[in-house]
Curated annotation (Swiss-Prot):
The gene is pqqA. There is a cross-link at E16-Y20 (Pyrroloquinoline quinone (Glu-Tyr)). One of its GO terms (biological process) is pyrroloquinoline quinone biosynthetic process. Coiled coil: none annotated. It holds the Pfam family PqqA. Keywords: PQQ biosynthesis. Required for coenzyme pyrroloquinoline quinone (PQQ) biosynthesis. PQQ is probably formed by cross-linking a specific glutamate to a specific tyrosine residue and excising these residues from the peptide. This is Coenzyme PQQ synthesis protein A.
Length: 26
């Protein structure tokens, strides 16, 4: 992953990880 991406891209990525973790815990 390119860490040069702006925070605008980091936020959606974080939300996807959150949803993924929630789905796996269920």
């Amino acid at each position: 992953m390119a860490w040069k991406a702006p925070k605008i891209v980091e936020v959606p990525c974080g939300m996807e990880i959150n949803m993924y973790v929630s789905a796996t815990r269920k």
